[in-house]
Amino acid sequence: MNLKSTGKLTLAANPLFALLLIMLLLCPHEALAAGNIEYLQPKPLYDCDTLKGVHLKPVKGGVLKIPLITWPGDVATIYTDQLGLFKKEGLDVQLFLENDFAKQVKAVLEGETPLLRGTMGMVNAAAETFAKQGTELVVLYQLTWSTGGDCLVVRPGVKSLTDLKGKNVALQLYGPHMDYLTTVLKKAGLRPTDVHARWLKELSVPAYDTHGKIVDPRSAFEAAADLDGAMVISPDANALTSGGTGTGAEGSVRGARVLFSSKSANRVISDVYAVRADYFKANRARVERFVHALMLGQEQFSKLLANKSSDQGAYKKLVSRSAELLFGSPQAVADVEGSLGGDCEWVGYSGNVSFFTGAGTTRTFAKLKDEIQSSFLELGLLKSKAPLQTAGWDYKAMAAGLANSKVAVAPKQAFDPTKAQRQVEKEIASGVGKWEKEGSLYSFEIYFAPRQAGFTAAQYSDAFKKALELSQTLGGTLITIEGHNSPDALNKAKADGKSDTQIALIEQAAKNLSYQRAIAVRQAYLDFCKQAGVPVDESQFLAVGMGTSSPKFPVPKTEEQWNANRRVVFRVKSVETELDSFKPSGK
């Protein structure tokens, strides 16, 4: 038989083909898929293909085009339009969806719209691009904080944030997770470059045909075993982890879990509107009316969400319109409603005043701008720091027509102190080593002298500032304040052959004393926060007496080691997976 003429092959006739076939059969599916991942090189936004050859043009007159992205925060903007509040402010507007941030930047540069919609991280990444074109960006309005919609999924070997050092993490380039990752790494004492960021084009699995290429973090994490983590949106996190711990079935990754989400780091991802500075200068009153309409609309939107059962007509109309604008189909109501269940917090008037003026918070525009741009310089996402302004609104005037214009209201109680104390004691009893490692995002220590009972802000101001910054950034975490005693008396009792009863009494006395010290430190810290003018959720801070259960040096040999055992540890704990054991009933 003439094999060539028939177009058929046999293994015997083609040894090379046979070898290739055997290699393919032996090669795991994951390895084959991993080879299709299309990673990108980090570079400033102005260097991306979309913006090559783009130049600044005057903003077109007429209709004000308002960009949206597929995020629950933008549902409030849609409701503002539905209520006719933009028209009442004398604005003729057109809402449009653009999830490709580079395309948004292109539209603003070319004058299609003066408005840019993104997170603070994305807007800071764009600031250098506008500076190179001879203008700047002005941040006008904060829509939301992400409070659950963004997650870090990890493989079983990663137990804490510090375990990420030297590891590979997938995330979208120019997307909302750039500063999310760098901020939480810094809070854990790591530098942005301590983690190997693997950049991808898309935020989530794209709807278009990628021709076999993997271009998003979820798909990359599923395909590549060398990825230790992935920054993903909550639906992708649920898929990868099977809603808890990945089983390896139905697109999940065996053993994968959410290390933390923006439910814990709930003051990191800030969604905002910005405007071209040249347009703002020429049209300040018009832009102010735009922001005022957003504030009025957000207040009405919050009222609708609270009373949707009694106003189903308006609610269904909003959800249908949002589904059409944000998901491309008025039938996608489940996607809209699913996103309204806790992915974000709409900040409203009070939140805008706090964010832009610093009233009652450390998580301000200026703070985020500085930490984001510093991190982006390290990662090569910026070549130099870029100007980014605020509008400098008169917020008293902006409050006109609002039902609620209070600022710096004390935060809601997130945890039930009794339930939290009981759960923490239970977890410590199951193993101190496990308690100190699993779920611990970060910890730091202060030290005290023998028989010291009092603790003041003057003594520990640096530590208290650090604790305040951590609690403000990671507002969904529990921060335990753990008292630790030196084991000297216990060691002596054991050496002297004391009875088990006597040893138990010494251990209990040490635990009681360490608890009293933890309480004293907690109170001194809360007093410090009051003096700083920053309202805090006191339930976030839990005093714990560790006694002699976890000495740094079980048998200290030097005075330095002896002193190091007398300490109070501030420990930031993620409690997302067991939240019912900590939160007040009905919340």
Regions found by a protein language model. Name each.
Residues Q82-L85, L91, L109-T113, E128, ...:
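Sec-exported extracytoplasmic/periplasmic mature domains
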